[in-house]
Amino acid sequence: MRFYSILSAVATLLLSSLPLHAADWLALPEQAPAPADNPTTAEKVELGKALFFDPRFSSTGTVSCNSCHNVMLGGEDNRPVSMGIHGKTGGRNSPTVWNSGFSASQFWDGRSPSLEDQAKGPVANLVEMGMADVETAMDRVRSIPGYKPLFEAAFGKDSMTVDNAARAVAAFERTLVTPNSPYDRYVKGEKTALNQQQIRGMNTFASVGCTSCHSGAAFNGPQMPEGNGFFMKFPTFADNAYVKKYDLLADRGRADVTGKEADAYFFKVPTLRNIALTAPYFHNGRVDTLDEAVKVMAKTQLNIELDKAQTEDMVAFLKALTGEFPEITMPRLPATEGWHIETE
């Protein structure tokens, strides 16, 4: 994989020599794009929100989508790795659900091409929600009378299917957008939205090469067609103390999905939006603080060491990516009638 190391180093040198232009910095749109076969409607969002918050579709009745992707927080659970049924823990850090509609693929390894596909995964995961399969989970949905009118309002008659449930959850997730951060206001022309330290951090972010991966409005790479995620090798430069300290070579990333050795240690480039709220960091959740994460990235991805001032400036800039969160209220879930959850 020496080719990728050389490519990254060349990209860094090229980027550091380029002037910064206002056109290189993009504000986050107010709405996430929706696919043609699943346009966002208020009815889908209402249904999807209920499904997202409902723990009854886990085998124990205790774990919902919101358990690991808490929209009352930064869209994750602030754990190194998420906790599922019976206190089981997974192997990766929970990505934020906020602004996930701007990602061309889902999961750290990009194994799902869309939010609709991703929504079907956790319910049948033995660690996360623990149902035997997605149809068993859907049978739970069908057994709750109050869900039928919600499905009919969103999709019409005889519409209580796995695919429609996934479409509804995805529609709700696409409303989870946090625009109008200080950074967004700055690039739109409000030049007092960032202070001088944040502006220095913004310039350092670009000049040292961070934008070779974290570009675009969501800071997760170039805009890609849905299903074609943007992946980078992590760590690119593995011969440093951080790699051992934080066990960064234990997870082979996308190679576990494709079976290709060339994909070893490649991961989806995550958004940096609201990153100050989503600790701990990286796919294994081993790094606790944002300043340490910045140092790790500089060394493992760019093979440079930032000084104290550069690190502090960049952290200040990254904190300026925290946007405005829409008000989220807990939904009133349809009542369970005539049955109870059989726990294992």
Briefly describe each language-model feature range.
Residues A23-G121, D184-K295, T329-E344:
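Short glycine/threonine-rich turn/loop motifs
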Residues L18-A22:
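Sec/Tat signal peptide C-region and signal peptidase I cleavage site
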Residues L126-M131, R140:
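A gly/proline- and charged-residue-enriched helix-loop-helix capping module
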Residues A11, G101-A104, A119-V123, P145, ...:
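Generic hydrophobic/packing signal
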Residues V134-P179, K268-P270, A276, R286-E344:
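C-terminal capping alpha-helices of c-type cytochrome domains
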Residues M1-S8:
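Bacterial N-terminal signal peptides that target proteins for export
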Residues M129, Y147, T175-T178, P182, ...:
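Short His/Asp/Glu-rich catalytic/ion-coordination signatures at enzyme active sites or charged loops
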Residues S8-S17:
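Bacterial N-terminal signal peptides
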